[in-house]
Design a protein with these regions (language model features):
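A structural micro-motif
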Residues: 31, 71, 128-130
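Glycine-rich FAD pyrophosphate-binding loop
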Residues: 11, 23-52
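N-terminal FAD cofactor-binding segment of flavoenzymes
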Residues: 46-85
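A structural signal for isolated positions on well-ordered beta-strands in alpha/beta enzyme cores
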Residues: 9, 32-34, 81, 131
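Active-site acidic short loop of glycosyltransferases
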Residues: 5-6, 30, 145-147
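Beta1/beta-strand and adjacent pyrophosphate-binding region of the FAD-binding site
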Residues: 2-16, 34
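Short alpha-helical segment within the catalytic ATP-binding CA
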Residues: 19
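Conserved N-terminal helical subregion
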Residues: 75-152
């Protein structure tokens, strides 16, 4: 690969890197953006991936909605209780108190990952300068240059 210059290089194809790439492409479709991804190219290879739940804030949902990347299956968080056993004090928040539908959401990592990959594929069709490179430990990326590098 000869020297390639990008506006943004995103190192990491997990949910944060995918969301960053999709949002940047949606806002700046002509930008030269590269996503370096160690995950398999084929979504079917991720079907049995990590099924643990992760908690996302309401703000994360709003961002993911803007790039059409909200998974269909999630559980809403209605109440948060923060305390330390044997210590004085606690914090308790409810969705009713804050006048929100939910304080956050629990989503399977695999579901958000696959939904973001699908959303990015749809967005990248309008971005002629997007470069999604699936890499491994043998891939040489030393010839890439960028104005901004995101480690995600």
């Amino acid at each position: 690969m000869s020297e390639i210059n990008f506006d943004i290089v995103i190192q990491g194809g997990g949910p944060v890197g995918l969301a960053c790439a999709a949002w940047c492409l949606q806002k700046f479709p002509e930008a030269k953006i590269a996503l370096l991804d160690r995950n398999p190219v084929d979504d079917a290879d991720l079907a049995t991936a990590d099924s643990r739940g992760i908690a996302l804030s309401h703000g994360s949902k709003l961002l993911l909605d803007t790039i059409n990347a909200w998974p269909t299956e999630c559980a809403d968080i209605h109440r948060v209780h923060v305390s330390q056993a044997g210590r004085f004090g606690r914090a308790l928040m409810t969705r009713e108190e804050l006048k929100q539908d939910a304080l956050g959401h629990i989503i399977r990592y695999r579901d958000i990952h696959l939904t973001l990959r699908k959303a990015l594929r749809a967005i990248q069709t309008n971005s002629p300068n997007f470069f999604w490179k699936h890499i491994d430990t043998q891939t040489n990326t030393s010839d890439l240059q960028a104005k901004c590098v995101v480690h995600a």
